[in-house]
Amino acid sequence: MSEFIAENRGADAITRPNWSAVFSVAFCVACLIIVEFLPVSLLTPMAQDLGISEGVAGQSVTVTAFVAMFASLFITQTIQATDRRNVVILFAVLLTLSCLLVSFANSFSLLLIGRACLGLALGGFWAMSASLTMRLVPPRTVPKALSVIFGAVSIALVIAAPLGSFLGELIGWRNVFNAAAVMGVLCIFWIIKSLPSLPGEPSHQKQNTFRLLQRPGVMAGMIAIFMSFAGQFAFFTYIRPVYMNLAGFSVDGLTLVLLSFGIASFIGTSLSSFILKRSVKLALAGAPLILAVSALVLTLWGSDKIVATGVAIIWGLTFALVPVGWSTWITRSLADQAEKAGSIQVAVIQLANTCGAAIGGYALDNIGLTSPLMFSGTLMLLTALLVTAKVKMKKS
């Protein structure tokens, strides 16, 4: 109880939201996401320039996710009492350094080192995002602030691949990463200007991160997070083969579907704060239930292009509630240990993304075209049931 009081005394004193700081965090998160996925659209020229296969070059994305998973788990144990403002500045420096190392890479090993630096920044920043947010705004404004941050994520996910592809043709892949390094420098200056001092956890309050899982409802919550994100990646990773073969979309048609998905996701994120103010638990249970029904509809009637497009829009709109909702759950139910809870959450999501994509791919190759949808829908239904039965939610 003393830890709760100590960590929230500063938060309780906040009467006016620091929106400049919130937007600086959102901008930094967006830059991290864009740089994370830049290689997806630049894979071919990167591979040709470095004299490696595209499959090997693709490991530049894998190593980032792998390092991010471990960074998220151990970052709070490492930084302890360090002022979080300085830690965030360090992450922005790592983002900039990563872009420069990749830009000047003349070997695959240097490329991986650069991408590993990004993984450290990505995992650490994501682990701290919820706890940072709740220290920048009053408690009643936390859902809105989180929706700003995840709105930036939605925009980044929509523009990362096409922006990288367009600029890569225009100025070359190395200069794309140089431009990203400039964004990193902007992050550094904006954070220095807007983010206040945020003292870390005193050493005498140090607590093992994994002890949080012993609290009532926390393990159930993390399992629900795992299943919902695994279900998402089992579906979304293979949306191209499913939509092109099941519904008969052309490449141009699929591009429009993905654009619609991205716009719907942004709208869903923007509306999430209004929904979460009414009931976080209802949102966390209702969203996966809607997604489970959507997966069933796509499995049964996905050959109709109108139905398939509608499902993509509903999916983007609905899943947008999930990351904002779970971050809100952490800020309310685990407010005294939000940073450590965020560490576990990020690691669980990274693992879920990997497992969901792997199992979905195996199902697609060995069972059938609609099998990733059935797997995804099953996970979403189980998530809804688990949240309803086991996940605890404290009122704000």
Curated annotation (Swiss-Prot):
One of its GO terms (cellular component) is plasma membrane. Residues 1-21, 76-85, 129-147, 197-215, 277-281, 327-343, 388-396 are cytoplasmic. It catalyses: inosine(in) + H(+)(out) = inosine(out) + H(+)(in); guanosine(in) + H(+)(out) = guanosine(out) + H(+)(in). It is a multi-pass membrane protein. The keyword Cell inner membrane applies. It is found in: Cell inner membrane. Keywords: Antiport, Cell inner membrane, Cell membrane, Membrane, Transmembrane, Transmembrane helix, Transport. One of its GO terms (molecular function) is antiporter activity. Coiled coil: none annotated. Disulfide bonds: none annotated. InterPro entries: MFS, MFS_dom, MFS_Efflux_Transporters, MFS_NepI, MFS_trans_sf. The keyword Cell inner membrane applies. The chain crosses the membrane at residues 22-42, 55-75, 86-106, 108-128, 148-168, 176-196, 216-236, 256-276, 282-302, 306-326, 344-364, 367-387. Residues 43-54, 107, 169-175, 237-255, 303-305, 365-366 are periplasmic. Belongs to the major facilitator superfamily. DHA1 family. NepI (TC 2.A.1.2.26) subfamily. Involved in the efflux of purine ribonucleosides, such as inosine and guanosine. This is Purine ribonucleoside efflux pump NepI.
